[in-house]
Each structure stands twice: as C-alpha cells, then as structure tokens.
Amino acid sequence: MGLFIFTLELKAHTMDIRHYLDATYLKTAAQANLSEVENIEVVKKAIQEAIEYQFKLIMIRPDQVLLAKELIQKARSKVTIGTVIDFPKGEGSVEKKMKEAQVAIANGADDLDFVINYKAFIKGAIEEVKQQVIVCTKLGLDHHKIVKWIIEVAALNQHQIVQLTALIKNTVIAHFSEKEYEKVFVKSSTGFYKTPEGVPNGATFETIKLMLENSFPLPVKAAGGVRTHEEALAMIQLGVKRIGTSAAKAIVTSEISNSGY
C-alpha cells in the first residue's frame, strides 16, 4: 500500500491533473430544485471555475453550449466545451442522435458525449448499436471533434461491460483510421442512472479496469463518483485519459493544498 501511495505522489509531481478533468454540471433546474434563472447562474459559475482553474473541459447541457462559448472566448481561455447527446437514457434513434450532435457542433462544442443505446445492446440488437457508433462517430470525426461513447456501467453486468466496450472498440477499428483512435473514448457513466441505495452508479476501479482491458487502443473516460484528489490520481494511474466530475475544483484544490507532501 505504501508503494502504491508513493507511486501516486511521484505521478502528482510529473503531470498536471487539470489536463484530465472534464468539469461537469449536467443538472436541469428541476433536478437541482432551482428556478431556471438560478440554474443558469450555477452553470455560469461552473464555466467560470473551469476558466479560472484551467480545466481541460467544461461539460454542460446542449442548450448551454453557446453560453459557454461566449464566456470562454471573452476570457480568451483554452478550456474546451463538451456536451451530452441523447442524454441520459440513450434510447433515441440514430437520427435523433445525429440531429442533436449537429446542433451541438454548430454551436461550438468540441467534445460530443453520446449515450449509447445500452438497452438495445442488452436485448441483443447488436447491429443497431454498431450503426449508431459508425454513423455518429463519423459525424464527430468529420468535424474534428472528440467523440465519447457512454456505456452506463451501472446498468450492465461485468460480462456486458466487457462485451459493449469491445464492440465499440472493434467497430471503430473496422471503420476508422488508426490516427483517429485517440479521438474516440469509451466512457463509463452518465451519473444519472438510478441504482439501489448504496450501489455506485458511476465509475468504480473494478469497472474501469474492465473497460481499460477491453478498450485499447481507444482511451477511457471515468465519469461519475470520482470526487477526491486521491481517487482522481488512482484513476489516472490505472490508465484513464479523462475524468468527468462535478468535483473538479475540490480535486484541484486538494492537489494544491497537498503539493508540499
């Protein structure tokens, strides 16, 4: 255990954790129990924090992309903008996903995080899922965007996590060039899947290991449940390339306060 902690401490001094963080705010006003005006203020605060702390990306709802673009350009910041497509259930048709993605692209999104139709996958509709991956990934890559496929690990058993991760990987390898692989992620979770009390609905070390073992050469994004500096470092140590979290500020603040140790 001591060696593992020492390794993490070494890693903390050789990389900037902010480059891994997709600072995330995806609650609607109703979900946050706020008015629309109050919720937009929360969104603005999240965007400003991403700018201030120089996170890799701010992840917000599609109807907030233009706002993020305006604030980031005004600040002359390098923070990129991500949004979610067919969120959070992923049950929409290819056409629905494409339409949402086209609007997000037009509004200035850099990353497109699609929720895959995991329910169709569970039911055995493999070709339908493959077609989603092919068509939507092509749209994103043709517009020089990063594409991420959310598989919703909390809805899957271990065997299904392995199968769906491998399906995305094999589909991308079969239809896109090697230079594009690093631009197509497999992502763990929406953070909105309802689980029994006490059961995690996001990334766990166990599920991320399964994804990493079966996604290569595609990168993995751990999303949901990563809330501390130590957890973020451990995920990076495992091999994830991005971390989606609503606790990005706390993660970085912890890093700053612990930097002398």
Segments the model singles out, each with a brief description of its role:
Residues 19-23, 27, 58-60, 81-85, ...:
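Hydrophobic faces of well-ordered beta-strands that scaffold small-molecule active sites
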Residues 69-86, 127-148, 166-172, 200-221:
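Alpha-helix-loop-beta-strand connector modules within alpha/beta enzyme cores
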Residues 111-183, 191-194:
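Conserved anion-binding
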Residues 13-41, 138, 210-218, 226-261:
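Alpha/beta catalytic cores of nucleotide-metabolism and tRNA/nucleoside-modifying enzymes
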Residues 89-103, 123-132:
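Glycine-rich anion/phosphate-binding loops
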Residues 12-94:
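Conserved N-terminal beta1-alpha1 strand-loop-helix module at the mouth
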Residues 107-120, 176-197, 226-261:
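Glycine-rich phosphate-binding active-site loops on the catalytic face of alpha/beta enzymes
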Residues 94-101, 157-166, 226-239:
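Catalytic cores of alpha/beta
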